[in-house]
Amino acid sequence: MKFDSILSTIGQTPHVRVSRLFPDHDVWIKSERANPGGSIKDRIGLAMIEDAERSGALLPGGTIVEPTSGNTGIGLAMVAAVKGYKLILVMPESMSVERRRLMLAYGASFDLTPREKGMKGAIERALEIVASTPGAWMPQQFENPANIDVHVRTTGPEILADFADKPIDAIITGVGTGGHITGVAQFLKPHWPNLKVYAVEPTLSPVISGGAPSPQPSAKEGPNLGAVTTVLVGNVPVMAGLWTTQLADEVAKSGG
């Protein structure tokens, strides 16, 4: 396969069966790590920037400013590098150094906020930067409709195409902004009315199920902001961070 741009390789990620770990069930993982930036957030990074270009909110030579806890920043940094935009990422100082190094490799700059203020503090600081920077634009991933729309246009149809011969019974996914689970559910529910959609969130920050957001990210970073989109979910299991980490280790050891 030949592509004119790395951005053309975003999406169309494979589905991989994890049969050794779940021998009695037909369980598949949609491997979003196959995106060039390593996560599903590449989709929204490209979608939000291109939507802003079409609307005129982001002009050539402009500056992108976004509060992010990690993967969205990587996606935005990759897209900004290809398209020639300056990118300022605002995040709590507690966020992963490894992720920061990757964003830096794409040419992004950082503004780190106090750990105790969490993502709310990062959002407040990002708004200050936008207000004082000519030509600046803030994607606002927690509120941007393009965050949901890209999953209606791409992720949902990809799932439907791969499982057209055998409808899925349930989709289980973690939740950050809510854009992924909302968009996928909106697209798939009309095709598969009996589909159950489950959002999984950490015990330290059970926002969707009615709990309080954590003031600090957990050791295994997860959502800590109470600004998640209303989603089309059937249930919201709350999982302990240690258990989910152990399960991820088992999946890696048994199926790669």
Locate each region found by the language model.
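PLP-dependent amino-acid enzyme catalytic core
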Residues: 1-235, 242, 246, 253-254
